[in-house]
Amino acid sequence: MEKSWFNLMFSKGELEYRGELSKAMDSFAPSEKTTLSQDRFIYDMDKNFYGWGERSSYSTNVDLLVSSKDIRNFISDDTFFVRDGNKNSYSIYFDIKKKKFEIDNDLSDLEFFFYSYCSSSYLNNRLKGDNDLHYDPYIKDTKYNCTNHINSCIDSYFRSHICIDSNFLSDSNNSNESYIYNFICSESGKIRESKNYKIRTNRNRSNLMSSKDFDITQNYNQLWIQCDNCYGLMYKKVKMNVCEQCGHYLKMSSSERIELSIDPGTWNPMDEDMVSADPIKFHSREEPYKNRIDSAQKTTGLTDAVQTGTGQLNGIPVALGVMDFKFLGGSMGSVVGEKITRLIEYATNQRLPLILVCSSGGARMQEGSLSLMQMAKISSVLCDYQSSKKLFYISILTSPTTGGVTASFGMLGDIIIAEPYAYIAFAGKRVIEQTLKKAVPEGSQAAESLLRKGLLDAIVPRNPLKGVLSELFQLHAFFPLKKNEIK
């Protein structure tokens, strides 16, 4: 099996375990430092052995040695070997699934690793005249950039993937001061010979990406999500798909939004069995419309691009419709229009407040004029709901909201709320520029710009959104059910 070896040294401060794990993990008590016997040895880059009582020429604070297939597997390993400046040695064990964090001085499980490390062909074949600890024949002129990149990757991963306080990894607040000293590459050299790596910089943060194996969250994709702006990792439920590093708002599925807004156990879906029947027999050379529908249904688990139903929001009965951009771009076809229409009619009869969460690319072209007529149909029942029955409708615009949805029920709310940085427009930037042959000003179609021009009532982040909706409903005389009213 091919292995890569990483020799990492913390350059700032001694390793301390302060028990300051994030609330996302269980609480742990600090572990005391333990000392090993003097007969243990570590093998350095110049193939010299040092006992724990001896002083290493390159180990001033903490040495950490691990074996893995590549950097993504390295940061997913369970056990790490650490030695601090006082020559105290530790075996640090992480178990993400079981939420375990242990520090132990029994390194018997790692003996095989050290034997393998000492006999590594990469180390044994290293040039004897090379005394530069930073030297790497494959990285060459980019060696320090790659080192800084690896530092950034590991720092980002540990903070988000294991939720460790930043003080656990470094005592320095300067992001430019690296806590990793050196990075040794694979003995086969395949990693450097590959041309599938590139450096992408965003917000002064470098990220090393592989076109073959980029997603490091594969094993925990039900818990973690990767920012498509800065490529940082975050815990889905705690952060609500908002990147804690750059503040970027990631897309949420309709099911995630329902879970965010509706009280647990109160959601009652409507018209789940309604599916599109390809009413105009749309012909496409690339992929038939029915095949695209079937593929989207398998991918998302939905029957179409909207979920509708009733539930309780902080105890207040509401009618809710949530569009899902992952289903054919959230496009509005006959099924989407019919489900929203039925939801509004039900809310009218039951006198329920209405919430519609918009995320759509517009009308579905595969259904022709049938998709366009949904705009008028929904607007008509909304007129009866709002004007005749005097009921309360809140429209929530998320990124992106464009086309027919913007031109109809998206902008008809009694209160129109948008998420921060949401892209809201009728025609997209590319369409406008191609049609008018003029550049669209940057940010002119963002929620903040629309708020300044009076097209929105408020921009509300995801975290306080549920509370804001609850207050708005109570302001309009919709109150939580009493205990004896809950069926």
UniProtKB/Swiss-Prot annotation:
Main localization of the protein described in the UniProt heading: plastid
Annotated positions binding Zn(2+): C227, C230, C243, C246
Domain CoA carboxyltransferase N-terminal, chain residue ranges per copy: 223-487
Catalytic activity entry: N(6)-carboxybiotinyl-L-lysyl-[protein] + acetyl-CoA = N(6)-biotinyl-L-lysyl-[protein] + malonyl-CoA
Source organism superkingdom: Eukaryota
Obligatory cofactor(s): Zn(2+)
Cellular component terms (Gene Ontology): acetyl-CoA carboxylase complex; chloroplast stroma
GO MF term list: acetyl-CoA carboxylase activity; ATP binding; carboxyl- or carbamoyltransferase activity; zinc ion binding
Pathway as given in its UniProt record: Lipid metabolism; malonyl-CoA biosynthesis; malonyl-CoA from acetyl-CoA: step 1/1
Enzyme Commission (EC) number: 2.1.3.15
Gene Ontology terms: biological process: fatty acid biosynthetic process; malonyl-CoA biosynthetic process
Record-linked InterPro entries: AcCoA_carboxyl_beta (IPR034733), Acetyl_CoA_COase_Trfase_b_su (IPR000438), ClpP/crotonase-like_dom_sf (IPR029045), COA_CT_N (IPR011762)
Segments forming C4-type zinc fingers: 227-246
Cofactor note as given: Binds 1 zinc ion per subunit.
Protein localization: Plastid, Chloroplast stroma
Enzyme class: transferase
Gene3D superfamilies per UniProt: 2-enoyl-CoA Hydratase, Chain A, domain 1
Keywords attached to this entry: ATP-binding, Chloroplast, Fatty acid biosynthesis, Fatty acid metabolism, Lipid biosynthesis, Lipid metabolism, Metal-binding, Nucleotide-binding, Plastid, Transferase, Zinc, Zinc-finger
Family according to the record: Belongs to the AccD/PCCB family.
Function summary: Component of the acetyl coenzyme A carboxylase (ACC) complex. Biotin carboxylase (BC) catalyzes the carboxylation of biotin on its carrier protein (BCCP) and then the CO(2) group is transferred by the transcarboxylase to acetyl-CoA to form malonyl-CoA.
Subunit structure: Acetyl-CoA carboxylase is a heterohexamer composed of biotin carboxyl carrier protein, biotin carboxylase and 2 subunits each of ACCase subunit alpha and ACCase plastid-coded subunit beta (accD).
Name by which UniProt lists this protein: Acetyl-coenzyme A carboxylase carboxyl transferase subunit beta, chloroplastic
Gene: accD
